[in-house]
């Protein structure tokens, strides 16, 4: 993402938040800590929301803190939605970069779908409840 290397695990799609923050701190001369993010009440509420909506079992969380010393697996690994929220917390201008990246990726995939996009939407809407599409 931009000038930052983002690491994602294949087994669960979690992202390494510690690695991203380390890169940010080195580039900007900052001293932010992942635990600062976890200390926010809004973070706790968001974690609860992810757990509720993604049907996490008790004792299973949308993040994992690893102390592994080998293989680059150390750090805090986060569910993709939690990672996006974390990345936006780092800095307001970085928040813009994160949102722009997500938006651009959405448009890119829509453009890749091209002429098939309306057909795809129709097919998806035929298998989902009608009230899902009402605002």
Regions found by a protein language model. Give the residues of each.
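An anion-engaging/catalytic patch
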Residues: 1-134
């Amino acid at each position: 993402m931009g000038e930052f290397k983002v690491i994602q695990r294949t087994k669960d799609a979690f992202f390494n938040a510690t690695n991203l923050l380390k890169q940010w701190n080195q580039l900007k001369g900052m001293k932010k800590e992942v635990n600062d993010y976890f200390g926010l009440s809004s973070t706790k509420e968001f974690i609860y929301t992810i757990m509720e909506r993604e049907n996490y079992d008790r004792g299973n969380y949308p993040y994992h803190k690893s102390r592994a010393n080998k293989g680059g697996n150390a750090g805090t690994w986060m569910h993709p939605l939690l990672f996006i929220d974390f990345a936006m917390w780092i800095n307001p201008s970085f928040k813009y970069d994160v949102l722009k990246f997500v938006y651009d990726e959405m448009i890119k995939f829509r453009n890749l779908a091209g002429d098939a996009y309306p057909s795809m939407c129709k097919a998806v809407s035929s298998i989902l409840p009608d009230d899902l599409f009402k605002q």
